[in-house]
Swiss-Prot record:
It holds the Pfam family PMT. GO terms for molecular function: 4-amino-4-deoxy-L-arabinose transferase activity; mannosyltransferase activity. It comes from the Bacteria. This is Undecaprenyl phosphate-alpha-4-amino-4-deoxy-L-arabinose arabinosyl transferase. It is found in: Cell inner membrane. GO terms for cellular component: plasma membrane. Its EC number is 2.4.2.43. It catalyses: 4-amino-4-deoxy-alpha-L-arabinopyranosyl di-trans,octa-cis-undecaprenyl phosphate + lipid IVA = lipid IIA + di-trans,octa-cis-undecaprenyl phosphate. It comes from Pseudomonas syringae pv. syringae (strain B728a).
Length: 550
C-alpha cells in the first residue's frame, strides 16, 4: 500500500510540474487582475511598506496584505518576472491538491480514493486555470482548505493531536483573514457549527473552538493594529465597502442573480461535469454518514451563503471544489469497483463530442473567416489542444473502467497550452506587458508616464518598476486612493491634457500607453499631440514624446 501511495504521489508531482509550473513564464500577464497583483506586490518590495497595500502609489484597501506578501516573496526569490508573479498561485493550488489527498486518506484510508480525489481536484477546470493565474483566490482557497482539514483532524483526534489540530484551525483562519478578509472566518463557522450540531457534539466545539478563535486573533492582531495606526480609515473602508456593500448593497460590484453559481459549479468541475448528478445522488443517499455529511455541508453551505451575496465572481466558489472532488472520487471508485461504467462512458463521450465539434468549427472558420491571421504556431497549438482533449476523453468513453482518469490529461494539456494557443487579437489586447517589453528601452528613459487604462498602466508600472503613472481620464477602482490630499495631481482629465502634456514635456521625455477601443478612448487618443513616435498593437498604442525645446 505504501508503494502504491508513493507511485500516486510521484504521478501527481509530475503533473504539477508539467501542467502547473512549466507554463507559468510563457505568456504575458492578463489584465486587470494579474498586472494589478504583480504591481502591488512589487511596490511592497521597493517601498518597504508591507502593512498597507498601494496600487501604483495609491492606497488600495480592497484586500488585506498577506496575499500580496506571498506574491512579493515569489518575485523576491524568482525575480520580477512572469514565473515569480504566478508561483504563489501555483504552489497554493498544488498544496490544496495535497490536502485533498491527505483528507481523503484520513476519511477513507483507501489509496484509490486518495488518488482519485487529488486527481479530480487537480484537473477541475477552475482549479487548474487559477493555478497559473496571479490572484488571491488560490491562496485563500488553500487556507480555507487547511482550516477545514484541520477541523476534521481535530474532531477525530484526542490529546495533544486534537489541541494541535485546533491550533492549526486558528492559524489557517488568521492567515486566511489576512489574505481575503472576514470570509475566512465565516465559511468555517457555517460549516463546523451545523456539523457539530448534527453529530450532537456542540459541547466539544464550545470547549475547543475558543482556542482556535484566540489563535486566529493572535495571528491577525499585529497586522490589524499596525494598519490601523498607519491608515486609520482602512477598517471602515474594508469592512463597509468590501464586505457589507458587496454582500447586500443595491449597487454591489459584480452584481449577479442568486442562481449564478449553480451553472458555474457545473462548469467548474469540467471535464468531470457529467459525474455530478451521480455524485450528488449518492452523497444525498449517504448523508447520514459523518464523513459524507461533513463534505456535503462544506460543499453546499458556502455555496448557499455566497449565493445570497449581491456581488459575485466565478472564483468565489473555489473553496467548494475540494469537498466536491472527494465526493466525486468516492462515487467514482465505488462505481469502478462494481463495474458500473455508464456515467463515466457518458462523460467521456460528451466531452469528446463537444470538443470534436469545436475542432471542426475552428477548421471551418479558419477556411471561411479566419480566426488566426498568419499565426501558424498559435493555430497549430489550438488544434493540438482540441485534438488532445478529444482523444483523452474518447479513451474514457471507449474504455471507462480502465481509462477513467484520461480526461485529466486533456485538462492539463488545455491549461498548459491554451494561453499560447489564443489568437494574437486576444493576446495583444488582454496581455499588454509583452508590448511594453518590446518598447521598454524607449519608455525607460521617460520622466513622465501616462495611460488611459488601468490594466495597461499597471503593466507599464510593473515592467518599468515605476508606480508613478498618471491616469488619463480613468480611475475606477483607484477612485478611493485618489481622494487623499497627498496624491493630488495623479489624475489628468480630458480638458486638462494639453496643459499636462506641455508641462510634462518641458521636464523631459514622456511615455504613454493608450487603449483606443471605445468612442471615449478614441477621443482620448485623438486629444494627444501628433508628433510622438507611435507603435500600435491590437487596440493598444504606445507613444513616446521627446522633451520640448526650451
Amino acid at each position: 500500500m505504501i508503494h502504491v501511495r508513493h507511485r500516486h504521489l510521484a504521478l501527481l508531482l509530475l503533473a504539477f510540474v508539467l501542467a502547473y509550473l512549466l507554463p507559468l513564464g510563457f505568456h504575458g500577464l492578463w489584465i486587470p487582475d494579474e498586472t494589478r497583483y504583480a504591481q502591488i506586490s512589487q511596490e511592497m518590495l521597493y517601498s518597504g511598506n508591507w502593512i498597507a497595500p498601494h496600487f501604483m502609489g495609491l492606497r488600495y484597501f480592497e484586500k488585506p496584505a498577506a496575499g500580496y506578501w506571498l506574491i512579493a516573496l515569489g518575485q523576491q526569490v524568482f525575480g520580477e518576472n512572469l514565473f515569480g508573479v504566478r508561483i504563489a498561485s501555483a504552489l497554493a493550488s498544488g498544496l490544496s491538491v495535497l490536502l485533498a489527498y491527505l483528507l481523503a486518506g484520513k476519511i477513507w484510508n483507501d489509496p484509490r480514493k486518495q488518488f482519485a480525489s487529488a486527481l479530480l481536484f487537480m484537473s477541475f477546470g477552475f482549479v487548474a486555470g487559477q493555478a497559473g493565474y496571479a490572484n488571491l483566490d488560490p491562496q485563500f482557497t488553500f487556507w480555507t482548505n487547511v482550516t477545514l482539514l484541520a477541523f476534521w483532524y481535530a474532531v477525530h483526534s484526542v490529546g495533544r493531536a486534537r489541541l494541535a489540530a485546533w491550533a492549526l484551525v486558528g492559524v489557517a483562519c488568521g492567515i486566511g483573514f489576512m489574505t481575503k478578509g472576514f470570509l475566512a472566518w465565516a465559511l468555517p463557522v457555517i460549516i463546523a457549527l451545523p456539523y457539530m450540531l448534527c453529530q450532537r457534539r456542540l459541547a466539544e466545539l464550545l470547549r475547543f473552538g475558543p482556542l482556535a478563535v484566540l489563535i486566529a486573533i493572535a495571528v491577525c492582531l499585529p497586522w490589524a493594529l499596525a494598519i490601523h495606526q498607519q491608515e486609520p480609515d482602512y477598517w471602515r473602508y474594508f469592512f463597509w465597502h468590501e464586505h457589507i456593500r458587496r454582500f447586500a448593497g443595491d449597487n454591489a460590484q459584480h452584481a449577479q442573480p442568486w442562481w449564478f453559481y449553480m451553472p458555474l459549479l457545473v462548469a467548474a468541475c469540467v471535464p468531470w461535469a457529467l459525474l455530478l448528478p451521480a455524485t450528488l445522488q449518492q452523497a444525498w443517499q449517504e448523508k447520514n454518514r459523518p464523513d459524507i455529511a461533513f463534505l456535503l455541508l462544506w460543499l453546499l453551505l458556502p455555496l448557499a451563503f455566497l449565493s445570497l451575496s449581491k456581488g459575485k465572481l466565478p472564483t468565489y466558489i473555489l473553496p467548494c471544489l475540494l469537498p466536491l472532488a472527494l465526493l466525486m472520487a468516492n462515487t467514482l471508485v465505488e462505481r469502478l469497483d462494481r463495474g458500473h461504467s455508464t456515467a463515466l462512458r457518458a462523460n467521456g463521450i460528451f466531452n469528446a463530442t463537444v470538443t470534436f465539434l469545436g475542432l471542426v468549427a475552428l477548421i471551418y472558420l479558419q477556411l471561411e473567416q479566419p480566426v488566426y491571421e498568419n499565426e501558424p504556431m498559435h493555430l497549430s497549438l489550438a488544434i493540438i489542444v482540441l485534438f488532445g482533449w478529444t482523444l483523452a476523453n474518447a479513451l474514457q468513453g471507449l474504455r471507462p473502467l480502465t481509462c477513467w482518469a484520461t480526461p485529466a490529461l486533456g485538462s492539463w494539456l488545455l491549461i498548459a497550452l491554451l494561453p499560447a494557443a489564443l489568437p494574437n487579437d486576444v493576446i495583444n489586447n488582454k496581455t499588454p506587458d509583452p508590448f511594453v517589453v518590446r518598447h521598454q528601452a524607449e519608455l525607460a528613459g521617460c520622466t513622465q508616464l501616462l495611460s488611459n487604462d488601468l490594466g495597461a498602466a499597471s503593466a507599464l508600472a510593473w515592467r518599468l518598476k515605476r508606480p508613478d503613472v498618471a491616469l488619463f481620464n480613468t480611475w475606477g477602482e483607484l477612485e478611493y486612493g485618489l481622494g487623499y490630499p497627498d496624491v493630488q495631481g495623479r489624475e489628468v482629465r480630458l480638458q486638462d491634457i494639453d496643459a499636462w502634456m506641455k508641462n510634462a514635456r518641458s521636464q523631459g521625455r514622456v511615455g504613454v500607453i493608450m487603449r483606443g477601443k471605445s468612442d471615449e478612448e478614441l477621443k482620448e487618443l485623438e486629444s494627444l499631440p501628433r508628433d510622438g513616435q507611435r507603435y500600435d498593437e491590437g487596440n493598444l498604442a504606445i507613444l513616446v514624446y521627446e522633451k520640448s525645446a526650451s
